[in-house]
């Protein structure tokens, strides 16, 4: 009985209370606007903090991209309630050019092959778009285009290396909440892995666009796929048509 009484006391005064204690916002790397929007429970806060701590340990053993202060860069450009388009990526570029925004790279880095194909589709469908000589997509993010990788870090030279450390539950939570709380949004899901996230999105109020990934590997593949090719998918035109119909204002895709 004494042992059971101690167990009950520990459960009430230690373990339960520990779960109720949250984590300071700065330790979650997220801006206050996003912390307010996500309303992470104390348990979820601790879970996210554990993933961040895990990545910090991995950084002592190998080079990890992007730098910690860039991991949540996708959340810095606009109020979450102002997001109009969500473009999902997989994990960051693993060659040192990742800047925290899916598909984007900082000025001074070559335009990656997948982004070149994105530019090609933009030019095909929107003749006023001229492919720039850089890969910085900050201008899109500032207009309400959320460029979110589903995995937020990667080891140098090893794509997919951080797929199982715990980022996916967090980005799934972000996607689900955006679907729940936004009135109308365009979700662009390119490739099979991004397409799997369609189940998190309410397609009755949002426009969900899927196609193959813009990578040259996917575009040059001769294997049959249920998804249409990226080039020719018309997603950027369809997105602006939807936004205009909803009275939200179009995205200026020019860079």
From Swiss-Prot:
A GO cellular component annotation in the UniProt record? host cell nucleus
Q: Where in the cell is it found?
A: Host nucleus
User: Which cysteine residues pair off into disulfide bonds?
Assistant: none
Q: Which GO terms describe its biological process?
A: base-excision repair, AP site formation via deaminated base removal
Q: What is its EC number?
A: 3.2.2.27
According to its UniProt record, which reaction does this protein catalyse? Hydrolyzes single-stranded DNA or mismatched double-stranded DNA and polynucleotides, releasing free uracil
Q: Which PROSITE patterns match?
A: U_DNA_GLYCOSYLASE
DNA repair listed as a keyword: yes
Q: Which InterPro entries match?
A: UDG_fam1 (IPR002043), Ura-DNA_Glyclase_AS (IPR018085), Uracil-DNA_glycosylase-like (IPR005122), Uracil-DNA_glycosylase-like_sf (IPR036895)
Gene Ontology MF terms: uracil DNA N-glycosylase activity
**Which residues are responsible for catalysis?**
91 (proton acceptor)
**EC class of the enzyme, as a word:** hydrolase
Keyword terms, alphabetized = DNA damage, DNA repair, Host nucleus, Hydrolase
Q: What does this protein do?
A: Excises uracil residues from the DNA which can arise as a result of misincorporation of dUMP residues by DNA polymerase or deamination of cytosines. Therefore may reduce deleterious uracil incorporation into the viral genome, particularly in terminally differentiated cells which lack DNA repair enzymes.
- Extract the PANTHER family matched here: URACIL-DNA GLYCOSYLASE
Tell me the protein family, please.
Belongs to the uracil-DNA glycosylase (UDG) superfamily. UNG family.
Protein's recorded name: Uracil-DNA glycosylase
State the species of origin. Epstein-Barr virus (strain B95-8)
């Amino acid at each position: 009985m004494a042992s059971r009484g101690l167990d009950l006391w520990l459960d009430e005064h230690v373990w339960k209370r520990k779960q109720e204690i949250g984590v300071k916002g700065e330790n979650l790397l997220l801006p206050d606007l996003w912390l307010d929007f996500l309303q992470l429970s104390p348990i979820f806060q601790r879970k996210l903090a554990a993933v961040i701590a895990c990545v910090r340990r991995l950084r002592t053993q190998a080079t990890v991209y992007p730098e910690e202060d860039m991991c949540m860069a996708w959340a810095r450009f606009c109020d979450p309630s102002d997001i109009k388009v969500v473009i999902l990526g997989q994990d960051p570029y693993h060659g040192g050019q990742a800047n925290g925004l899916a598909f984007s790279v900082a000025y001074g880095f070559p335009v990656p092959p997948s982004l070149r194909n994105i530019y090609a589709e933009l030019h095909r469908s929107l003749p006023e778009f001229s492919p720039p000589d850089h890969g910085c997509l900050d201008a899109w993010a500032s207009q309400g285009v959320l460029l979110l990788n589903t995995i937020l870090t990667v080891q140098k030279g090893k794509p997919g290396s951080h797929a199982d450390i715990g980022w996916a539950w967090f980005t799934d939570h972000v996607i689900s909440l955006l679907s729940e709380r936004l009135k109308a949004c365009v979700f662009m899901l390119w490739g099979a892995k991004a397409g799997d996230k369609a189940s998190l999105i309410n397609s009755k109020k949002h426009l969900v666009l899927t196609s193959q990934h813009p990578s040259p590997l996917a575009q040059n593949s001769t294997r049959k796929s249920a998804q249409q090719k990226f080039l020719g998918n018309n997603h950027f035109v369809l997105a602006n048509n939807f936004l205009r119909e909803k009275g939200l204002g179009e995205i200026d895709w020019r860079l």
